[in-house]
Amino acid sequence: MDGIKYAVVTDKSIRLLLKNQYTSNVESGSTRTEIKHWVELFFGVKVIAMNSHRLPGKGRRMRPIMGHTMHYRRMIITLQPGYSIPPLRKKRT
């Protein structure tokens, strides 16, 4: 699982869990087909849709030199009904 970095936990990503959509940051060089293959193989789920967007890096200053952090990609992965990713499953009360 070299392409998937980590799951994202924000207000929007928590709302998307109710729609069976999972959000994670991935390597910027990974393709959609690679990510889909990794998710289906590693978690044993069926992916029906994937949305992605590129987030810009942040500016960093070290005295007179202005640098920046690397940009990254975020994927929103929609699973077929009945499938879920166990570590991110919402607890029902």
Swiss-Prot record:
GO terms for molecular function: mRNA binding; rRNA binding; structural constituent of ribosome. Coiled coil: none annotated. GO terms for biological process: translation. InterPro entries: Nucleotide-bd_a/b_plait_sf (IPR012677), Ribosomal_uL23-like (IPR013025), Ribosomal_uL23/eL15/eS24_sf (IPR012678), Ribosomal_uL23_CS (IPR001014). Pfam families: Ribosomal_L23. Keywords: Chloroplast, Plastid, Ribonucleoprotein, Ribosomal protein, RNA-binding, rRNA-binding. It is found in: Plastid, Chloroplast. GO terms for cellular component: chloroplast; ribonucleoprotein complex; ribosome. Belongs to the universal ribosomal protein uL23 family. Part of the 50S ribosomal subunit. Binds to 23S rRNA. This is Large ribosomal subunit protein uL23cz/uL23cy. It comes from Populus alba (White poplar). The gene is rpl23-A.
